[in-house]
Regions:
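N-terminal signal-anchor/start-transfer transmembrane helix
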Residues: 13-33
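Juxtamembrane boundary at the C-terminal end of a transmembrane helix
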Residues: 68-72, 122-129
């Protein structure tokens, strides 16, 4: 297994966990204090449940870009689309910053390490793919 694949697989696995978390929020799990800055402790209201589903979908798209860039799935990124790998890097970097500044201590404890793993692995794929 090459370095690019070795970086992409943890990204995909971690994103699956985050997607599961988002879908659990959408289904009513009482974990609102660990998302969205802790603004909705307990169960998300209806509009935030919809937002959680949208976030899960976007995370799936970001994971597909990383995995395709590493030729783990699809193997569809022709040279003209190679720049797409920088989108997950930017999204992951933004997640690190937002999770560092969140007012929710629980959210910081959980999601800063997760977003750092996503940033490191997506950056490694971007630099080696």
């Amino acid at each position: 297994m090459g370095l690019t694949t070795a970086a992409a697989l943890p990204f995909g696995g971690v994103v699956l966990i985050v997607i599961a978390f988002q879908l659990a929020l959408a289904l009513g799990a009482p974990w609102g204090s660990y998302a969205m800055g802790g603004a909705f402790p307990g169960r998300f209201p209806a509009r935030m449940r919809v937002a959680a589903v949208v976030q899960a979908g976007l995370l799936g798209l970001v994971a597909a870009i990383v995995l395709a860039s590493a030729n783990v799935v699809f193997q569809m990124l022709d040279p003209e689309l190679r720049w797409l790998i920088w989108l997950p890097v930017v999204v992951s970097a933004a997640a690190v910053v937002l999770n560092l500044i969140t007012p929710s201590a629980g959210e910081r404890r959980i999601w800063v390490p997760v977003s750092l793993v996503l940033l490191a692995s997506s950056l490694l794929v971007a630099l080696t793919a």
